Amino acid sequence: MIDVLVAIEVVKWLASDLHYNSTGPMFYALHLLADRVKDFGSAEDDLKEGYWLGCLDTTPPSDREIANAAISAYDKVVDGKDCPIARLLAGLTNLGVVVDELKSDASLNGGVHAILDDISNRTNVYTFLVRAQSQQNVPPVQSK
């Protein structure tokens, strides 16, 4: 389950990369898109409380543990991609895969499945928006 928290963190970092590397005529649209994609509501808190505290009766991973795992995950997601929007799309795709794998686990209780469904729904919407933007005939966003 920590993989979901790590993948969300990576998506947030990638959205920040897009946010701060967008210039030119599409600046504001990309800026707003990046802000929207960072919003997973209370998903992280819900997972920590619903899964670790509620189901496992143990403390959730610390922010430090999540951040350390996210650093290497970030490097894997961005490998070979030089455009922030392509990186964000890769991060969202990875998050979707991670969540879908966990959703197939029948041993998880209904509350955890509901949390994963919410993350999955947001991920699907954000993936659609980012993919649509990446296919527009606009100047590419260059990373620095």
Enumerate the predicted regions with their spans.
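Long amphipathic alpha-helical segments
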Residues: 49-57, 129-144
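Alpha-helical transition-metal enzyme core signature, strongest for iron centers
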Residues: 4-15, 34-48, 88, 92-96, ...
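N-terminal non-cleavable signal-anchor helices
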Residues: 7, 11, 78, 139-142
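Helix-loop segments that flank and shape redox-cofactor active sites
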Residues: 10-36, 101-110
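Conserved alpha-helical segments that form or flank metal/cofactor-binding pockets of metalloenzymes
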Residues: 26-64
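Short, surface-exposed polybasic-and-hydrophobic patches located at secondary-structure transitions
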Residues: 61-68, 142
